[in-house]
Every structure is written in C-alpha cells, then in structure tokens.
Amino acid sequence: MATEAPPPVDTTEVPPFTAAETAVKQPHKLERKWTFWFDNQSKPKQGAAWGSSLKKAYTFDTVEEFWSLYDQIFKPSKLTVNADFHLFKAGIEPKWEDPECANGGKWTVTSSRKANLETMWLETLMALVGEQFDDSEDICGVVASVRRSQDKLSLWTKTATNEAAQMGIGRKWKEIIDTEKISYSFHDDSKRERSAKSRYTV
C-alpha cells in the first residue's frame, strides 16, 4: 500500500530576514586599522629609557570592536595620574622617532575637569575612525594625558610645516571638541624645549 506524500510546507508565513538583521551579523569595517596604546609613567623604572613604558594594546578595524574596546577599557576616567591613552593609525608608534611623526607636531587642548577630557576624547575618537577630517592622511593619532594639575588632549599630525593642512585640521578639531582655543607646536621644538612655543593657534 503506497504511503501518502507529506503536504508541501507553506513558506508564505516565514518572515524574510530584514536588512537590519542581516547588518547585525556583518561587522562594519572602518576605512583603516587603528591601534590603542597605553603608557603609565607614574612608576618609572630606574634607568629606563624614555618611552619604555609605552605598550601596544589592541588593533581593530570595525565599528563594533571600537565601541567594545572604548566601553570596557579606553576611557580617560580609568587612567591614573601620569598615565596616557593613545589611538594611532596602525603601523604608527606614538613617538617622535617614528618616521610618520618625525617631521610633525601636535594640536593641544588642556582641561582641569575630568568630564571635559572624557567628552573631548570620545568626540575625537569618533571623528578619527569616522574619517571626518578633510586632511585625514596627515593625521597620526590622538593622546589623552591625565596629570595632577590638568589633563591634556593632543592631536598628532605628520607635516608640521604644511600650515594650510594644519590650520584645516585645527579648525575642524576645535569645532569637534567645542572649545575656545587650541594651539599647535612642532615636535622639533618640543625636543629642544620642555614647553615649546605655539606655532599656530585657532
């Protein structure tokens, strides 16, 4: 006796995957890779060379990785006094000696309020990984420094003598972090003098 074939499955009731559901499964790639670094100078070892406390932490290239790392670790509020967080393009070390930084300089803003540093740091990170700067190829990275007297945020660039590029970056950064004034110093000047004079101001 022949068995009856099972009835066909009605697929009209199965909801299709939405674009949003599909997107969740696919990480959102950034335009380039970035690396977080950590530096703690609060307990320097005797005779240690400058920069020896600088440690590479994580390299990432997706939006999801960025937010996970930021939320769990890389907030200035988690830093002790005399410690720094860095976010630099992958392949560039946050040192004057790095070939990409050797002829550069930095825009700097100071803050006496921890909350301000936290906000400016996050706004800067999002602008960097989101490629919001017109002269983004001239940017190396950003450093958040927690100090006893006041905190500091520094945006490092490659070609200090390219005034047009630096002023464009400076104006955009000032707008992003919503501050009154920022100044730019050359790394070469900083090597010679502890408090290097400002070359550009916006």
Swiss-Prot record:
SUPFAM superfamilies: eIF4e-like (SSF55418). GO terms for cellular component: cytoplasm; nucleus. Changing residue 119 to I: In haplotype E1, allele pvr6(5). According to the redox status, the Cys-101-Cys-140 disulfide bridge may have a role in regulating protein function by affecting its ability to bind capped mRNA. Disulfide bonds join 101-140. MRNA binds at residues 46-51, 78, 96-97, 147-152, 191-194. GO terms for biological process: regulation of translation; response to virus. Changing residue 27 to S: In haplotype B1, allele pvr6(3). PROSITE patterns: IF4E. Disruption phenotype: (Microbial infection) Truncated protein associated with pvr6 resistance allele, correlates with resistance to pepper veinal mottle virus (PVMV), especially when associated with the pvr2(2) allele of eIF4E. One of its GO terms (molecular function) is translation initiation factor activity. Changing residue 56 to N: In haplotype K1, allele pvr6(8). InterPro entries: TIF_eIF4e-like, TIF_eIF_4E, TIF_eIF_4E_CS. The keyword Mitochondrion does not apply. It comes from the Eukaryota. It is found in: Cytoplasm; Nucleus. Changing residue 24 to S: In haplotype Ih1. Keywords: Cytoplasm, Disulfide bond, Initiation factor, Nucleus, Protein biosynthesis, RNA-binding, Translation regulation. Transmembrane segments: none annotated. It holds the Pfam family IF4E. Residues 1-24 are annotated as: Disordered. EIF4F is a multi-subunit complex, the composition of which varies with external and internal environmental conditions. It is composed of at least EIF4A, EIF4E and EIF4G. EIF4E is also known to interact with other partners. In higher plants two isoforms of EIF4F have been identified, named isoform EIF4F and isoform EIF(iso)4F. Isoform EIF4F has subunits p220 and p26, whereas isoform EIF(iso)4F has subunits p82 and p28. (Microbial infection) Interacts with viral genome-linked protein (VPg); this interaction is possible in susceptible hosts but impaired in resistant plants. Component of the protein complex eIF4F, which is involved in the recognition of the mRNA cap, ATP-dependent unwinding of 5'-terminal secondary structure and recruitment of mRNA to the ribosome. Recognizes and binds the 7-methylguanosine-containing mRNA cap during an early step in the initiation of protein synthesis and facilitates ribosome binding by inducing the unwinding of the mRNAs secondary structures. Key component of recessive resistance to potyviruses. Belongs to the eukaryotic initiation factor 4E family. Displayed sequence is from cv. Florida VR2, cv. Yolo Y and cv. Yolo Wonder, cv. CDP06433, cv. CDP09688 and cv. Zunla-1, with allele pvr6(+) (haplotype C1), and correlates with susceptibility to pepper veinal mottle virus (PVMV). This is Eukaryotic translation initiation factor isoform 4E. It comes from Capsicum annuum (Capsicum pepper). The gene is eIFiso4E.
